[in-house]
Amino acid sequence: MPEEVHHGEEEVETFAFQAEIAQLMSLIINTFYSNKEIFLRELISNASDALDKIRYESLTDPSKLDSGKELKIDIIPNPQERTLTLVDTGIGMTKADLVNNLGTIAKSGTKAFMEALQAGADISMIGQFGVGFYSAYLVAEKVVVITKHNDDEQYAWESSAGGSFTVRADHGEPIGRGTKVILHLKEDQTEYLEERRVKEVVKKHSQFIGYPITLYLEKEREKEISDDEAEEEKGEKEEEDKDDEEKPKIEDVGSDEEDDSGKDKKKKTKKIKEKYIDQEELNKTKPIWTRNPDDITQEEYGEFYKSLTNDWEDHLAVKHFSVEGQLEFRALLFIPRRAPFDLFENKKKKNNIKLYVRRVFIMDSCDELIPEYLNFIRGVVDSEDLPLNISREMLQQSKILKVIRKNIVKKCLELFSELAEDKENYKKFYEAFSKNLKLGIHEDSTNRRRLSELLRYHTSQSGDEMTSLSEYVSRMKETQKSIYYITGESKEQVANSAFVERVRKRGFEVVYMTEPIDEYCVQQLKEFDGKSLVSVTKEGLELPEDEEEKKKMEESKAKFENLCKLMKEILDKKVEKVTISNRLVSSPCCIVTSTYGWTANMERIMKAQALRDNSTMGYMMAKKHLEINPDHPIVETLRQKAEADKNDKAVKDLVVLLFETALLSSGFSLEDPQTHSNRIYRMIKLGLGIDEDEVTAEEPSAAVPDEIPPLEGDEDASRMEEVD
């Protein structure tokens, strides 16, 4: 039975908190939590729920609003009293509601929340278990709740969390209808009385609540009055505060006089400081995602985007949609104009899509809501079906969320396709986010085809403009069965590469892929529109040939068979095989990689990885093939020399030099560049007619040994033998 205390006519009843609630409050008060600010979110969310209820009731019975038409939430900090007050004009509580809801009947979530807390859950989840009110004790030592329901008198609930609370009829200032929560803040929590802090917390957690949240602040302003009024005001103040030691001072900020001898002299004026109450609405940005897209202007979208992201520029594109049926949610998605500098920083928490459930903010870093490759998309998702008490663990298992995610990805791809029709804007988008699209091709097998339609590349025929793979296919020759591409560091480098010589000469278009991520992209993108993607830097390049060309190729293979064998013997393990090339025109030779090995570009990328796996590098790098150009005079002369004497040291020397030069021109790096340089210098001396013996006689220290170790050795295979 509650204990009754009589104070004159006022009856105060004391109740004990239900055991689980007392335990929860003890946990909240005695444990340190860093994000105490969530108490404000919870109290505002409760106020919003109460306003939702009265609004719903008023739909069937408009007279419910006779006790107050305006639906709003007010926040009133009072530094003198050290109180923070929240007032709403919601449905209010009856005495029975007060006793039951705030203390004697445990909500089903109380125990679950305590178990979650002890298991390491975050305090910010408190509202999701229906016990958000008690988060007030994170910052308050005492809480007073004054409430008025249409069906009952005005009551006051009060507790300092000592295991009990009191309820009494309240004969103070009538509040009409609704609830007033007065927090008597702890000494170390006065930051929540500061204008800046309150605004910051409301903006972070509650800026999209569907009712106006107004902050009431006592401020000072200067007022200009005449001397007579100043004297009167001063007199009044002195009378009011005559018992006070410190009397208010009227600040004289100067007087305006006219030195006119006329009778109409201007009255002397003084400036005094007066106090006034400033009212500022904190959530002017209403949840526009709940409105009809046809009624929203681009300016409104722009303002909303800026308030959501703190970006100073407008968005590039927007997609506003709702899904109805078995599942109901609304979403508003934006593409920014530029990529953030930390777009691919793994450790950084991305707060790009805010998740709301029925207009109440749940979280802003929900990985399950959008795949990583779309992490640049900003926006809001508001679900009608997710429970408010959703936790991160539950989200990971949520089937509803999986459906929402699928829809978001689909709508994002629609948005990209729409944007692609506007060449100018798509160019800006592609410059900023092409890496994301390529990452999507690598990761998202379901949407790979749609993503591949969004890719744009420079090609051997596109000039300064970029072209899509669809446009490439539309320009393909009748005999062409594949899409030819080359990967490299820059457009200039790949355009001048030996690999594209024959392909371009035959009139086939080559796609230039110059971003490191392209290497990963083409590993997954094997074909486009039924046409396979073929690298011109890998073995097995097949160009459409007529009978004459086939015959010529067979003759060349037979003619150069012995040279190929000899070159393979000289280079030994450096190459897997030496063959006749069908891709060279003006270059004597090139290095190609096996179909499944790394390209030169990929090898360069992998070597640059700080945490590379050396075991993988060993077998992926080993597959190099040397292709020689049968029509090149260097190769023809080398064949003749080899036919004459296959043990000629000069032949061996030239083969190694050709191989190393081909490595460089094909985009690979040399393991021992110094030896290669020495070999080149020696060639220069020969060309200039400088006698090697003279140099060695003058500088014995720089003498070259008579016999350089043989080329066949694993370690020293790249060293050059002395030229006779």
UniProtKB/Swiss-Prot annotation:
Residue numbers carrying Phosphothreonine: T297, T479
Localization, UniProt: Cytoplasm; Melanosome; Nucleus; Secreted
N6-methylated lysine sites (modified residues): K531, K574
Sites of N6-succinyllysine modification: K219, K531, K577
Region feature Interaction with NR1D1, mapped onto this chain: 620-723
Name this protein carries in UniProt: Heat shock protein HSP 90-beta
Acidic residues compositional bias, start-end: 225-244
Known function: Molecular chaperone that promotes the maturation, structural maintenance and proper regulation of specific target proteins involved for instance in cell cycle control and signal transduction. Undergoes a functional cycle linked to its ATPase activity. This cycle probably induces conformational changes in the client proteins, thereby causing their activation. Interacts dynamically with various co-chaperones that modulate its substrate recognition, ATPase cycle and chaperone function.
Domain notes: The TPR repeat-binding motif mediates interaction with TPR repeat-containing proteins.
Residues linked to a glycan: S434, S452
N6-acetyllysine PTM sites in chain numbering: K435, K481, K624
Region feature Interaction with BIRC2, mapped onto this chain: 1-214
Site (Cleaved under oxidative stress) residue list: I126, G127
Activity regulation: In the resting state, through the dimerization of its C-terminal domain, HSP90 forms a homodimer which is defined as the open conformation. Upon ATP-binding, the N-terminal domain undergoes significant conformational changes and comes in contact to form an active closed conformation. After HSP90 finishes its chaperoning tasks of assisting the proper folding, stabilization and activation of client proteins under the active state, ATP molecule is hydrolyzed to ADP which then dissociates from HSP90 and directs the protein back to the resting state.
